Amino acid sequence: MHATIRRYDGVDQNRTAELTGKVNESLIPKLSKLDGFKGYYLIEAGNGIFSSIGLFETPEQGEASSKLASSWLRDEKLETAFPNPPKITSGKVVGHKNGVVA
């Protein structure tokens, strides 16, 4: 399994509800249709910081998810809400345990 973590700094805090709504309504359904999709999590850390974790079977599928997310931001006209490019970390998942996430 491959994980892609994106950290977004400086997100417009006045648009948090709009952003999270659009992620849940349109981005996650698009990501879930990609080959190898295993999961997606969006984390609001506060102070204009959001992180996301995408899980896919292969690195190539993870890269495809990053391209889709970038296109999605443009298509939804959300670039101004995300003034800084994301910091992206990706790699092979070498340890995990599934459980209930609240």
Question: Residue ranges of each PLM-predicted region?
Answer:
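Short S/T/G/P-rich N-terminal loop/turn motif that feeds into the first structured element of a domain
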Residues: 1-51, 57-71, 78-102
